[in-house]
Structures are given as structure tokens and as C-alpha cells.
């Protein structure tokens, strides 16, 4: 295959990043699945592909593939990696970039400390925009599970779909079992990422996330944004929230519901390599 890649991570949410500007890259679903295997491949949560854009005002196309090969529209941790990747490898000299994903535009700012701030846009709550099959918009929805039990959750889109559940203790939350049931629930026709949120105080939440196509990851940028938005809208938290994930902390700023929500956090390089087959 002979494709150069870079392994990166954002708080342990790990990626391979591919330069589609200087290389011709066409990966199949099966190839991505094989590369994502942590025993026989490289191992990663997502595969990120940066490509040239022909659209004025957009610096790059930013494509995101989950470990199951599915292309998705949002990844906040990956966006921070893409920004540092583009500058490090000389694809741009700019510290402020605009990238286009499958579903949205994102503004990325590389800060002086090499953290990256990501404009994640304005969160959307309308069921049709999430998407969620529901008769009307509601602060909370009830889903009936296969075992007959009912679970209450919030639903929101931040460029990709998220369900958020309030729990007393994330350490004992059934993230994998319940997360999987909700992620594949037929009321979410494009599947859904599932966040389990514990409110610590007015300015901090703890969070674990089951990501569609991946399972639980130790950090999820868009999940942090979704949970912080729900916390601010329905639980009266501050306009600046620290989200503590198993992999570390992210800062979310959201001055008001009509403004874009901003995610700030680190990104790190791990190693370079070449895909041989």
C-alpha cells in the first residue's frame, strides 16, 4: 500500500492521521476495520483523513472514519490533531483553519501553548436534526429497551448525534452494556454516541462515553461538548465547564444557547509509519 501515516491522540482518544493532500488514498471499509484492530493492525478509535478543499474559505476537508469503517461527521479530539498535523507537516502555516467534515464546518485555532480550540458550532436539539425519531422536541426522552426497561435521556447534535444520561457515579455506570443498547436503538436511525454524565459542581462534570462504531473510549471531544451543553441548558451549570474524562480534562465554553460552543484541549504526536498492506 505504501501510505504514510501518523499516530496521534487527544487525551488517549487515538487516531491514525493520513495526508490525502500529498497522497492518493482510497481505503475500503474492510481495510479500515483491519487497520483498527489492536492485535493485528495499528489499533485506533478513528482514522482521520485530511484532503485539499476546492471551496473558497475552507482550508481542508476533514474526513473521519470510525473503527468499524463508517464515515461520521464530527470528532472534536480528532479536529485538534488535524490542526497540529496540518501545521507540523507544512500543509499550512496558519494558526487558524476552517475545515469541512461530512456534516459541518469547523474553525480550529492553535493556541500559543499548542492546545487547540475548536468551534463546534451551535448545538441542535430538534429531533430531525439529531436525528431522533420523536413526535416533538422535549428536554428529555424515554426509550424502551429490549428487556422491557425504560431509560430517560437527553438528545442533542453537535455535528453528530449524542444521547446524554445523568448518573450519580460514572464509575459504576453501565457504560458498555447500556451504552450499546442505546447506541443501536431504532429511535436513533444513524446510531448515537452515549454519554454518562455526573455533575460534580457548578463548573465541572465527570463523563464517560460509548462511541458508536467504537465502544467506550477514554476521551470523546464531541461527547464532552454535548454533555456540557446539556448540563448548561437543563442543569444550570456555568458558561465555562471542565469536563473530566478517563483520559483527562477538556474545557468547554458556551456563553449562550445561540452562540457557537468552543472546545479546548491538547493533541499529541505518537509516531510515524507506513501502511504496507
Curated annotation (Swiss-Prot):
Enzyme class: isomerase
MF terms (GO), sorted A to Z: diaminopimelate epimerase activity
Cell compartments where the protein resides: Cytoplasm
InterPro entries: DAP_epimerase_DapF
Site feature (Could be important to modulate the pK values of the two catalytic cysteine residues) residues: 162, 211
Entry keyword annotation includes Isomerase: yes
GO biological process, one term: lysine biosynthetic process via diaminopimelate
Residues annotated as binding substrate: 13, 46, 66, 76-77, 160, 193, 211-212, 221-222
Catalytic reactions on record: (2S,6S)-2,6-diaminopimelate = meso-2,6-diaminopimelate
Domain of life: Bacteria
Gene3D superfamilies, per database record: Diaminopimelate Epimerase, Chain A, domain 1 (3.10.310.10)
Residues the UniProt record annotates as site (Important for dimerization): 271
Any GO CC annotation of this UniProt entry: cytosol
Signal sequence range: none
Pfam families assigned to the protein according to its UniProt record, in alphabetical order: DAP_epimerase
Residues at the active site: 75 (proton donor), 220 (proton acceptor)
EC numbers: 5.1.1.7
Record keywords, A-Z: Amino-acid biosynthesis, Cytoplasm, Isomerase, Lysine biosynthesis
The keyword Amino-acid biosynthesis is assigned to this record: yes
Pathway involvement of the protein, from the record: Amino-acid biosynthesis; L-lysine biosynthesis via DAP pathway; DL-2,6-diaminopimelate from LL-2,6-diaminopimelate: step 1/1
Assembly with partners or alone: Homodimer.
UniProt xrefs under NCBIfam families: DapF (TIGR00652)
Task of the protein: Catalyzes the stereoinversion of LL-2,6-diaminopimelate (L,L-DAP) to meso-diaminopimelate (meso-DAP), a precursor of L-lysine and an essential component of the bacterial peptidoglycan.
Protein family according to the UniProt entry: Belongs to the diaminopimelate epimerase family.
Record protein name field: Diaminopimelate epimerase
Natural source organism: Legionella pneumophila (strain Lens)
